[in-house]
Amino acid sequence: HKEFPVLYKGNMFKRTSDTTACIKAFVKNDWVWVDVVFRPQDLFKRGVHEWKECNPKLVKQGKKYFLNISYEQQVALHKEKIQHQRICAVDLGLTNSAVCSVLDANGTVLARKFIRHQREKDQLRRATNYLRKAQRQTGTASMPRYWNRINGLQKQILNDTAAQIIQFAKQHHVHTIVFEYLDKMRIPKGYYGAKKLRFKLHYWAKKGIQNKVEEMAHYEGMRISRVNPRNTSKYAFDGSGEVKRSPRGDLAIFSTGKQYHADLSASYNIGARYFIREIQKSISEKEWSALSANVPTLTTRTKQTLASFITLRTVFSFS
């Protein structure tokens, strides 16, 4: 799209009603006032009816022009103490768009949610296969039709996943949403063609979901936190050690023989690592060393699980 400079109120923009306005445009070598009509918006439904209206922008998309009006307000993020916090731990997996679990400061799992987009992901897989096949046949052709389809599906998955995460967090009165920290993209060996493209799309979608959720969470007064992602799926949440994956990869087989959803187990560990880190930050190094002696798994951050946090809570009480 093409974005024009900001239309400052008074000398570039004058609102005449809820759906009409005058904007100053350069037409035929002269600056003239042009009457425009735009679609009405339900500000009450969007929750911005009491917010300050900012200067609009004129945006051109294709052959159409849109008037983008933003609103602003000072929003205070929560300052709840760690012992009273309720978090939503989110694991952005492969088989599911996201797996969410709500935990409290005692390690109790209060709610769970699976967010799936099977239809969109199947369509995305077909679109990437068609794109790679067409590029092999034509060489370096850009293939805008396929890319428009892929980008549209990516945007649908991203926006819907972020909206469901925020809705789930609001439903359970969450204070903080916790994600894994995403480092630079490292493509594994043996990934090429459509498989390599899907890996890139999946990584870009995860980054986009985190950014979108952060924006929407701050709008609701929630905070965002990120934890070390290493081995969250590798270790069982019950402390039984490393897990094996089922042939499909969606189930984790514990050393005890128990089978559990791999992404759900990872979300428990993500939430536990957040609470462990916040407890460590709130006490002295001497106290933490004493606690680590009682709970040895705390010494290695990449091996911390929900069982580690529950054990920590048995020897540590909030002041």
Locations of the language-model features?
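Nucleic-acid substrate recognition interfaces
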Residues: 1-319
